[in-house]
């Protein structure tokens, strides 16, 4: 057993060593890869630091200028918007005020006209009514003329009729002549009536027109009042909006001013933060490089230690594999040592894996920083393009400066003629040189590494020129008398400077060539950028396709997993059904076990009762045997009283112990009681003889010597049989005690199984039934377990053993009952030959 265990442990140790070796190889490969990646990352970081330092210096000024320009443009836009809003508001206000003044004038005119119409007469009202009243007057005049024409026609007709009537009256005589004045008399009355009616009608019409005009004037006045109220409300709203706009303008102006100040402060803070960040990044990079170098040294040392430990372990394993079969105990000790060393190696491996994880995290952090720096690098490349454009502009400015310098040389030649012009040109040159110095300083800060030593020389020369010019100006201001001599020296210097400027022009041409080369490099970078963008797009498309494929695969896998889940659920249902069947079988087995236990208890009770009866019978038989021995001794001592033997047998037949044995027999000796009853029924005359000596039948006077010898022989045989029975009873007691012990032991085993199963199941689930052997099986044996068949076999074996033991107990009980019956028969049997001769006699 120890040898098998040591071989298993040896195999396990070999497997662990192989795993450690593979892990070591993997770790060494990962370390090599990480080292290569770190070197590439360091190179990238160094290159990016250089580019970052270049671009940051260029950004520090370009950003400020751009942000200031943006803020100024925003401020100008806001001011323009405010001015436009103010102009719009002024125009709206002026139009509203003009409309309001017009409405007020119209209202005043209408009120005056209304008062005049109310106060004035009808004619004046008609005269002042306007074009409508004039139209009515024309209509009325036309009607009046028409009426006059009608009246004229009527008068003519009336005149004709009057002429006819006068002719008739002349023909008839004088009497009708008196009627003429009566007919002509009503004519002026009719004319007066007509005029009166016409005037009346005209007055009525004028009155109606006046009422209509008053109603229209009232409606117009109400409408104008409503419009006035609306316009006043609009005016109030416009004034409120104007005040609001004024306040908003002030707030916007203040906000823009505050924003400009905040942005300037933020620029300064950002500049400081960027400087601090760059310093911090440089420090972190230096610390990371140092830590990487230290980790590399540690890793190399640990790798060497690992290799040495692995070699030592391999040597030990080879030695142990050679001597494993011969030295088992030594292998066990070495296995323990190897376990400790393996534990230490596992700890070292865990530490190394942790360190590797830390390194991976650091590499991921560095990769993230690299991505950020790459993004910043891309921004800087865009800014670099802007700076290149600015560089071209600066080169153009340099060309212009060269032209200006040539012009300055010509002006310097004319300085001897005109001192005042020289002063003015010197001042102009000073201002232009200041601007040139500022531009050159900006270019110096922006293109420090690109232009290099040539630009430094150029800037030094420009600064020297500026210093010389300033010095010359100071000398001109200090001493006017020596200006001519100094100007002559300056002319000589200017000639030399023109030569230097020619050399500078050559350098500028070289710089232009460099700029052209930079433009070519820029085009190459742009092409590379386009290629990178195309590759990025292709990679994105590939990633999208891969994502689609992964999603499709995931959907297919999900479908497969769902089908597998359905199959597993079906299997679980089948297992549940099998579990229910097993639980049913376990419950039936539990019931059977309970029945067998109850039967065993009943049999134990019966066996204990039978043992008690047998012990009682043995005790009584011993007493009887003692009495019989005493009687036999008495008979042997008194050979004359042979008839006492017969009395003894009869008294034994009728003794209370005999009746007690018959009454106190067990359930298993039921046949023995029946036999005793038969014997008692057959031995009634013997009882009567022993109970009443007066009514005894005549007995034989003496027994023969042969009969006495037979009796002694029978007594000896009965005594031997009694001893045999006692030995059998003792054997049965021992076997029953062993059976009781076996039963107690098995019940204790079952109780221990039950307790263990209860403890195990109480941890898992506290609501299961734990009573009996069925609960034990239900708790220990779950459906689908591989040990179910073994447990069933064990239970079957236990049941078979219990059944066989029960069968043996039944057989032993039957044997005991048969022995008891036989003993009772033998005990009852000896008096029969005595009774037979008595009956015969």
UniProtKB/Swiss-Prot annotation:
Q: How is it modified after translation?
A: Proteolytically cleaved by caspase-3. A minor C-terminal proteolytic fragment of 30 kDa is produced. Proteolytic cleavage is required for JNK signaling activation.
Tell me where in this chain the PTM N-acetylalanine is found: 2
Q: Which UniProt keywords apply?
A: Acetylation, Cell projection, Coiled coil, Endosome, Membrane, Phosphoprotein, Protein transport, Synapse, Transport
Say where the protein is mainly found.
Answer: membrane
Q: How does it sit in the membrane?
A: Peripheral membrane protein
GO CC terms, sorted: axon; blood microparticle; cytosol; dendrite; extrinsic component of postsynaptic early endosome membrane; glutamatergic synapse; intracellular membrane-bounded organelle; neuronal cell body
Q: Which GO terms describe its biological process?
A: negative regulation of receptor clustering; protein transport; regulation of neurotransmitter receptor transport, endosome to postsynaptic membrane; regulation of recycling endosome localization within postsynapse
Residues of the region (Disordered) are 532-551, 558-580, 681-706
Q: Where are the annotated coiled coils located?
A: 4-161, 208-641, 701-735, 785-814
Fetch the InterPro entries from UniProt. Answer: GRIPAP1
Site annotated as Cleavage: where?
598-599
State whether it acts alone or in a complex, and with which partners, per the record.
Interacts with GRIP1, GRIP2 and AMPA receptors. Interacts (via C-terminus) with MAPK8/JNK1 and MAP3K1/MEKK1; the interaction promotes MAP3K1-mediated phosphorylation of MAPK8. Interacts (via N-terminus) with RAB4A (in GTP-bound form). Interacts (via C-terminus) with STX12.
Q: Which PANTHER family match?
A: GRIP-1 ASSOCIATED PROTEIN 1 (PTHR18978), GRIP1-ASSOCIATED PROTEIN 1 (PTHR18978:SF1)
Q: What does this protein do?
A: Regulates the endosomal recycling back to the neuronal plasma membrane, possibly by connecting early and late recycling endosomal domains and promoting segregation of recycling endosomes from early endosomal membranes. Involved in the localization of recycling endosomes to dendritic spines, thereby playing a role in the maintenance of dendritic spine morphology. Required for the activity-induced AMPA receptor recycling to dendrite membranes and for long-term potentiation and synaptic plasticity.
Q: What else is known?
A: Antibodies against GRIPAP1 have been found in sera of a patient who developed Raynaud's syndrome and telangiectasias.
Kindly provide the name given to this protein in its UniProt entry: GRIP1-associated protein 1
């Amino acid at each position: 057993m120890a040898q098998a265990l040591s071989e298993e442990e040896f195999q396990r140790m070999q497997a662990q060593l192989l795993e450690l070796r593979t892990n070591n190889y993997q770790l060494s490969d990962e370390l090599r890869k990480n080292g290569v990646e770190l070197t590439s990352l360091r190179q990238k970081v160094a290159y990016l630091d250089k580019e970052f330092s270049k671009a940051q210096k260029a950004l520090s000024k370009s950003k400020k200028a751009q942000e200031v320009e943006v803020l100024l443009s925003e401020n100008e836009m806001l001011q323009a918007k405010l001015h436009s809003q103010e102009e719009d508001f002024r125009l709206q206000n002026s139009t509203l005020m003009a409309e309001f003044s017009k409405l007020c004038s119209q209202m005043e005119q209408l009120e005056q006209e209304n008062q005049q119409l109310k106060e004035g007469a009808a004619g004046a009202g008609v005269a002042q009514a306007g074009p409508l009243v004039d139209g009515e007057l024309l209509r009325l005049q036309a009607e009046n003329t028409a009426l006059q024409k009608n009246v004229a026609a009527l008068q003519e007709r009336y005149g004709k009729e009057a002429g006819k009537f006068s002719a008739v009256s002349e023909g008839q005589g004088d009497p009708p002549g008196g009627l003429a004045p009566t007919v002509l008399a009503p004519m002026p009355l009719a004319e007066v009536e007509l005029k009166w009616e016409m005037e009346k009608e005209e007055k009525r019409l004028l009155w109606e027109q006046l009422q209509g005009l008053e109603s229209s004037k009232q409606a117009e006045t109400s409408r104008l009042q409503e419009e006035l109220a609306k316009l006043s409300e609009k005016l109030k709203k416009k004034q409120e909006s104007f005040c609001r706009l004024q306040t908003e303008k002030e707030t916007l102006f203040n906000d823009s001013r505050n924003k400009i100040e905040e942005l300037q402060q933020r620029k300064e803070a950002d500049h400081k933060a960027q400087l601090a960040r760059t310093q911090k990044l440089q420090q972190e990079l230096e610390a990371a490089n140092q830590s990487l170098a230290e980790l590399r040294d540690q890793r190399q040392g640990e790798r060497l230690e690992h290799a040495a430990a692995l070699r030592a372990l391999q040597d030990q394993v080879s030695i142990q594999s050679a001597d494993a079969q011969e030295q088992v105990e030594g292998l066990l000790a070495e296995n323990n040592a190897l376990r400790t060393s393996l534990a230490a190696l596992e700890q070292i491996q865990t530490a190394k894996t942790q360190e590797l994880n830390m390194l991976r995290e650091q590499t991921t952090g560095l990769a993230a920083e690299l991505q950020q720096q790459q993004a910043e690098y891309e921004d800087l490349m865009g800014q670099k393009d802007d700076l290149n454009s600015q560089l071209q502009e600066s080169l153009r400015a340099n060309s212009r400066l060269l032209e200006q310098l040539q012009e300055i040389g010509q002006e310097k030649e004319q300085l001897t003629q005109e001192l005042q012009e020289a002063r003015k040109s010197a001042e102009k040159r000073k201002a232009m040189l200041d601007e040139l110095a500022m531009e050159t300083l900006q270019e110096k800060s922006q293109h420090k590494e690109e232009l290099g030593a040539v630009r430094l020389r150029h800037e030094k020369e420009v600064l020297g020129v500026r210093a010389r010019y300033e010095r010359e100006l100071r000398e001109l201001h200090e001493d006017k008398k020596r200006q001519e001599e100094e100007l002559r020296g300056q002319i000589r210097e200017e000639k030399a400077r023109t030569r230097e400027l020619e050399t500078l022009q050559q350098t500028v041409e070289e710089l232009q060539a460099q700029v052209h080369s930079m433009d070519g490099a820029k085009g190459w970078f742009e092409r590379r950028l386009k290629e990178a963008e195309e590759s990025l797009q292709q990679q994105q498309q590939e990633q999208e396709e891969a994502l689609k494929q992964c999603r499709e695969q995931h959907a297919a896998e999900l479908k497969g997993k769902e089908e597998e889940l359905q199959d597993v659920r079906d299997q679980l249902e089948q297992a549940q059904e099998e579990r229910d069947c097993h639980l049913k079988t376990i419950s039936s087995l539990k019931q059977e076990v309970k029945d067998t236990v109850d039967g065993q208890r009943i049999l134990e009770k019966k066996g204990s009762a039978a043992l008690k009866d047998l012990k009682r019978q043995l005790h009584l038989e011993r007493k009887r045997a003692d009495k019989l021995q005493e009687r036999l001794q008495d008979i042997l001592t008194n050979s004359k009283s042979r008839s006492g033997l017969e009395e003894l047998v009869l008294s034994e037949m009728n003794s209370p112990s005999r009746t007690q044995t018959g009454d106190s027999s067990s359930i298993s000796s039921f046949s023995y009681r029946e036999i005793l009853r038969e014997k008692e029924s057959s031995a009634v005359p013997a009882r009567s003889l022993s109970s009443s000596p007066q009514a005894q039948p005549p007995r034989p006077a003496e027994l023969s010597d042969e009969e006495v010898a037979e009796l002694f022989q029978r007594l000896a045989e009965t005594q031997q049989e009694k001893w045999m029975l006692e030995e059998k009873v003792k054997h049965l007691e021992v076997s029953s005690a062993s059976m009781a012990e076996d039963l107690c032991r098995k019940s204790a085993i079952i109780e221990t199984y039950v307790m263990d199963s209860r403890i195990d199941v109480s941890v898992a689930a506290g609501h299961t039934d734990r009573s009996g052997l069925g609960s034990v099986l239900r708790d220990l044996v779950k459906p689908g377990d591989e040990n179910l068949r073994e447990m069933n076999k064990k239970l079957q074996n236990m049941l078979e053993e219990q059944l066989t033991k029960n069968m043996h107990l039944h057989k032993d009980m039957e044997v005991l009952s048969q022995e008891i019956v036989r003993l009772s028969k033998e005990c009852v049997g000896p008096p029969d030959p005595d009774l037979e001769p008595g009956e015969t006699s």
